[in-house]
Regions:
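Conserved Rossmann-fold NAD(P)-dependent oxidoreductase catalytic core, especially the SDR/UDP-sugar
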Residues: 76-121
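Catalytic helix-loop patch of NAD(P)-dependent Rossmann-fold dehydrogenases
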Residues: 102-147, 151
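Glycine/proline-rich active-site loop of Rossmann-fold NAD(P)-dependent oxidoreductases
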Residues: 127, 140-143, 152-163, 194-205, ...
């Protein structure tokens, strides 16, 4: 029986750290691809890759390049998957592809669009790549699986919405209703392993705790002490007014808007399908 071969793109990223080792431990033969191995935009032409792969797991994002470059990378990645007879492409997306104003969202919820979003940078790149893959995936001879995690924690990485101050005081970027789904890196890796091994996957998986915890309650549980919040009418209302008056760019306003994300996000279908419980 031949060894099952996996390609990891972006294997040196924070989220991918340790994933190669897990796959090897589970009996897979693993190749990795990063910037030192060649041009992402021409990955389909890279002669160093194997003749075939069972699955490709993509963590890579070209953060310092344009949206167009990132979509071009997706085109090259898809072509490489065709050439290498890949059975499934697992694309690491983000919960940032959703509008902050859906109210409730699950694995079937529509994503935001490049035309509609006020975000720039990472979030907009992820939306653009998701849009591209969704627009043509029906023509692929392989399975495309979108993985949308919350904020990934590991190695004592602090939650980005908690700012520690002296004397046991912390400030959260938001108010008591604000939410930010989170997930442990080890749980991300376990879910990806299950996705690789599954005969048939959901089109989209949500990787984050299914407990609807608010930023405020998360801060109380993890850092304790005195937790201060930022009033929405000041820290979202004033920037919104400035944006409407042409004094603030939409992309900058979207950062304030995101601080008051009240979406109730569910990973119920993911936990059921993969028989996993995000902790």
């Amino acid at each position: 029986m031949s060894t099952r071969k996996i390609l990891i793109c972006g294997a040196t990223s924070f989220v991918a750290k340790g994933f190669k080792e897990l796959l090897i431990q589970e009996g897979f033969d693993v190749d990795t691809f990063g910037r030192k191995d060649g041009n992402y935009l021409e990955i389909d032409k890279n002669p160093m890759l194997a003749d075939s792969y069972e699955a490709v797991v993509n963590f890579a994002v070209l953060k310092d390049q344009s949206i167009e470059d990132n979509v071009s990378y997706m085109k090259s990645l898809v072509e490489m998957c065709r050439q290498k007879h890949v059975k499934k492409l697992i694309y690491f997306s983000s919960i940032m592809v959703y509008s902050y104003h859906l109210g409730k969202l699950d694995e079937n919820s529509p994503i935001d669009t490049v035309a509609n979003t006020m975000m720039e940078g990472y979030g907009k790149i992820k939306i653009a790549c998701d849009e591209f893959l969704n627009s043509i995936k029906q023509s692929f001879p392989f399975e495309v699986v979108m993985v949308r995690p919350g904020y990934v924690l590991a190695d004592n990485r602090p939650a980005p919405f908690i700012k520690r101050l002296p004397c046991g005081v912390s400030v959260i970027l938001g108010n008591k209703k604000s939410r930010q789904p989170i997930v442990k890196r080890e749980d991300v890796h376990l879910a990806l392993l299950k996705i690789i091994e599954a005969d048939k996957n959901l089109p989209v998986y949500h990787l984050f705790q299914n407990n609807d915890i608010t930023k405020y309650n998360f801060a109380k549980q993890t850092v304790g002490g005195l937790i201060l919040v930022l009033p929405k009418f000041i820290f979202e209302g004033l920037p919104r007014l400035m944006m409407k008056m042409g004094m603030m760019k939409k992309a900058l306003y979207s950062r304030f808007d995101g601080m008051y994300n009240y979406n109730v996000a569910s990973s119920t279908m993911t936990e059921s399908k993969l028989n996993i419980k995000f902790k």
